[in-house]
UniProtKB/Swiss-Prot annotation:
Top-level class of the enzyme under EC nomenclature: ligase
Subcellular location: Cytoplasm
Predominant location category: cytoplasm
Catalytic activity: tRNA(Pro) + L-proline + ATP = L-prolyl-tRNA(Pro) + AMP + diphosphate
Comment field on protein domains: Consists of three domains: the N-terminal catalytic domain, the editing domain and the C-terminal anticodon-binding domain.
UniProt-listed InterPro entries: aa-tRNA-synt_IIb, aa-tRNA-synth_II, aa-tRNA-synth_II/BPL/LPL, Anticodon-bd, Anticodon-bd_dom_sf, Pro-tRNA-ligase_IIa, Pro-tRNA-synth_IIa_bac-type, Pro-tRNA-Synthase_IIa_type1
Stored CDD domains: ProRS-INS (cd04334), ProRS_anticodon_short (cd00861), ProRS_core_prok (cd00779)
GO BP terms: prolyl-tRNA aminoacylation
Name under which the protein is recorded: Proline--tRNA ligase
NCBIfam families, sorted: PRK09194.1, proS_fam_II
Length: 571
């Protein structure tokens, strides 16, 4: 490809609204352009990378035995009503009506559509197992699109769906897709980890996320220091403390704390250790209990894990905090003064709080706290659960080592759905005994467009992108110095371009009438792995200059050897 015939569209300056490195570089390298909030046009350079990710994913998913299909982006709303997800998805599900006032949605995922298809097309166990996938545009009406294509409203995704006669078959299909993901991300040259995850709105019995490790990642991942255990912080279990609760050494006393509205203020003003304080959070209760509010009690230095809270039968989904008005109506006090002593509402205590003694908490009276609280003596302990986020140094749930935390970008997710959707939509087949059996489903997603951004977050420097070879928009750049003033430089560049192109190598030939500095900057910004510089001075010495984008090393290569040298670099 000649730059004179190509839409290069590089930018010198970083746009002000680009927060993360990948967004900045994708705009500057001419990969994408913003059309509206969360909506992007993919320019030729970006599309070349996107297609490479697609092709690697397609090859590995094909190798795992899945079959490609293509489903509509527009889906009938009634399908979503069949599974009950029409409400669970919330406002992210974009709904609209056609001219006949029939309700539809823009597809964020396709469990309902594929289940309806299999329900109609597969009738016998002899047709199983089957795994169908597509690579297609999806739409989620994100409330706050940000970070470019990392969290866009419209995005490209590979979504696959397996159907098996039993759980053993599902586990086999799930493992095959797990292995296919690993092979795909290995080929892309990414540093990634599969981690245990919550199933969220998709549902099902078990799931894993695939995270590209990057400091800009939105997710925190917990890793064991001595095993291969890894989990999203939403899923990582906070192991119950191994110590027994100490015996009381203090009497419970009521203390005036008019200026202590937060744990930090309480600690600073009254000299109590933060590990000896608790936070009492009021959340909306589910229909499983009669009370409108349930209290969740965690240690003062810990954070509530909202996913763990939502998974409690007593807590409404999605998690919703009680308002100040609701707190005052129920107990007569507001946030900052709440606690378990004398509380007339159901409460659930975190494991770490259950072993505390002589601790401080709000007295359910504005501006007052109790110090020296002890379970059993001053208040009954009641229900205990894992409510908090893990922190570095916590024991690993696997029993080996402690936990360390790193940030990651989720690029893939696999689920063992079981019969959540197939049962709701009556998707079954006749087994070998002629009995109708509801199918076991798995679903699998890779954010193809997000992989592009994640790869940049992991591979960049101050000059621009450093693509892994498998993802680069072009494999080789040819930069002829002052080509339009030197006939022999032009002839050498044209000859080399023709030779490399004939070999099937993807080459970007910079034939613009530009200063060499501009040409070098653009090639580094775009991130082409291998650059050949052709100039009069080097030709006088009988060589071209080869530059490796990742290492930055420059190597003189004899003109007669350059083709074989490049072939060796690409192997």
């Amino acid at each position: 490809m000649r730059t004179s015939k190509y839409l290069l569209s590089t930018l010198k300056e970083t746009p002000n609204d680009a927060e993360v490195v990948s967004h900045q570089l994708m705009l500057r390298a001419g990969m994408i352009r913003k059309l509206a909030s969360g909506l992007y046009t993919w320019l030729p350079t970006g599309l070349r990378v996107l297609r490479k990710v697609e092709n690697i994913v397609r090859q590995e998913i094909d190798n795992a035995g899945a079959i490609e299909t293509l489903m509509p982006v527009v889906q009938p709303f009634e399908l979503w009503e069949e599974t009950g997800r029409s409400e669970k998805m919330g406002p992210e599900l974009l709904r609209f009506t056609d001219r006949h006032v029939r309700p539809f949605v823009l597809s964020p995922t396709a469990e309902e559509v594929i289940t309806a298809l299999v329900r109609n097309e597969v009738s016998s166990y002899k047709q199983l197992p089957i795994n169908l996938y597509q690579i297609q545009t999806k739409f989620r009406d994100e409330r706050r699109p940000r970070f470019g294509v990392m969290r866009a409203r419209e995005f490209c995704m590979m979504d696959a769906y397996s159907f098996d006669i039993d759980k053993a078959g599902l586990e086999k299909s799930y493992q095959a897709m797990h292995d296919a993901y690993c092979k795909a991300f290995d080929r892309m040259g990414l540093e990634y980890r599969p981690v245990l995850a919550d199933s969220g709105a998709i549902g099902g019995n078990g799931s894993q996320e695939f995270h590209v490790l990057a400091e800009s990642g939105e997710d925190l991942i917990a890793f064991s220091t001595e095993s291969d255990y890894a989990a999203n912080i939403e899923k990582a279990e906070a192991v119950a403390p191994a110590v027994e609760r100490a015996a009381p050494t203090q009497e419970m006393t009521l203390v005036d704390t008019p200026n202590a509205k937060t744990i930090a203020e309480l600690v600073e003003q009254h000299g109590i250790s933060i590990e000896k304080t608790v936070k009492t959070l009021f959340v909306k209760a589910s229909d499983a209990i009669e009370a409108p509010i349930v209290a969740l009690i965690i240690r003062g230095d810990h954070e509530l894990n909202e996913i763990k809270a939502e998974n409690l039968a007593e807590v409404a989904t999605p998690l919703e905090m009680a308002t100040e008005e609701e707190m005052r109506e129920l107990i007569g006090a507001g946030a900052g003064s709440l606690g378990p002593v004398g509380l007339k509402l159901p409460f659930i205590v975190d494991r770490s709080v259950a072993v505390m003694s002589d601790f401080g908490a709000g007295a359910n009276i504005d501006g007052k706290h109790y110090f020296g609280i002890n379970w059993g003596r001053d208040v009954e302990l009641g229900q205990v659960a894992d409510l908090r986020n893990v922190v570095e140094g916590d024991p690993s749930p696997c029993g080996k080592g402690t936990l360390m935390l790193k940030r990651g970008i989720e690029v893939g997710h696999i689920f063992q759905l079981g019969n959540v959707y197939s049962e709701a939509m009556n998707c079954g087949v006749l087994d070998s005994n002629g009995k109708n059996v509801i199918l076991e489903m798995g679903c699998y997603g890779i954010g193809v467009s997000r992989v592009v951004a994640a790869a940049i977050e992991q591979n960049n420097d101050k000059y621009g992108i450093i693509w892994p070879d498998a993802l680069a928009p072009f494999q080789v750049a040819i930069v002829p110095m002052n080509m339009h003033k030197s006939e022999r430089v032009q002839e050498a560049a044209e000859k080399l371009y023709a030779e490399l192109t004939a070999m099937g190598i993807e080459v970007l030939f910079d034939d613009r009438k530009e200063r060499p500095g501009v040409m070098f900057s653009d090639m580094e910004l775009i991130g082409i792995p291998h650059t050949i510089v052709i100039g009069d001075r080097s030709m006088d010495e009988g060589h071209f200059e080869y530059k490796n984008r990742r290492s930055g090393e420059k190597t003189p290569v004899a003109m007669a050897d350059i083709v074989e040298y490049i072939k060796a670099q690409l192997e």
